């Protein structure tokens, strides 16, 4: 039995809209957001995720994936030896995040929300057992263009107009 939801909050538009939908549907007390930065995660993304979580009053934590990624790369070093870096290394980042979210889900009884939109899913811009790992996707039938429109709409229709539900810098 799930008592709430957890999602990876990247500081991007898709996870930001998913978080807003989850809070609208369940209330902030039943939603957890996790930022899982890697060495290339921008300060802008970190700040946007933190700001939105605070604005919406959800439980928020930061779990860096650098150590997990390094361990995976060490374990795979014999297999990757002599091969050029490619999308495989990027997919390991997504899969590390998926493992962390599933661990939180199992331990706390929270449903993992995935955040990919219909456009990304249609063209295969996602990672199996990574950002696709979860129990429900609120944006599964929402195109990327509509994601932006919904984000703007949600911000314009906030009960508390002085609080951005989705940080404007994420929409821009």
Where does each model-flagged region fall?
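Active-site adenylate/phosphate-handling loop in enzymes that bind or generate adenylated species
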Residues: 26, 56, 79-160
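ATP-dependent adenylation/pyrophosphate-handling site
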Residues: 5-9, 13-50
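Flexible loop/turn segments at secondary-structure boundaries
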Residues: 13-17, 40-44, 62, 68-72, ...
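A conserved beta-strand->alpha-helix junction
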Residues: 30-31, 35, 43-88, 94, ...
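Phosphate/ATP-binding catalytic cores across multiple sugar-kinase/actin-like superfamilies
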Residues: 1-6, 100-104
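Short, glycine/charged-enriched secondary-structure capping and boundary segments
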Residues: 21-22, 47-49, 76-77, 126-130
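Short glycine-rich phosphate-binding loop at a beta-alpha junction
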Residues: 3-9, 111-114
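Flexible, glycine/charged-enriched surface loops at secondary-structure junctions
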Residues: 2-6, 161-168
């Amino acid at each position: 039995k799930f008592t709430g939801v957890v999602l990876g909050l990247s500081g991007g538009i898709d996870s930001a809209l998913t978080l807003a939908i989850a809070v609208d549907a369940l209330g902030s007390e039943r939603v957890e957001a996790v930022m899982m930065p890697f060495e290339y995660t921008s300060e802008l993304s970190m700040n946007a995720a933190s700001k939105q979580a605070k604005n919406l009053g959800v439980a928020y934590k930061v779990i860096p994936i650098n150590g997990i990624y390094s361990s995976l790369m060490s374990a795979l070093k014999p297999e990757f030896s002599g091969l050029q870096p490619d999308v495989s290394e990027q997919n390991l980042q997504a899969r590390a995040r998926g493992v962390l979210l599933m661990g939180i889900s199992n331990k706390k009884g929270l449903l993992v929300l995935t955040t990919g939109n219909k456009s990304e899913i249609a063209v295969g811009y996602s990672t199996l057992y990574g950002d696709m790992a979860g129990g429900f996707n609120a944006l599964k039938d929402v195109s990327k263009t509509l994601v932006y429109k919904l984000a703007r709409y949600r911000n314009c229709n906030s009960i508390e107009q002085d609080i951005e539900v989705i940080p404007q810098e994420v929409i821009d």
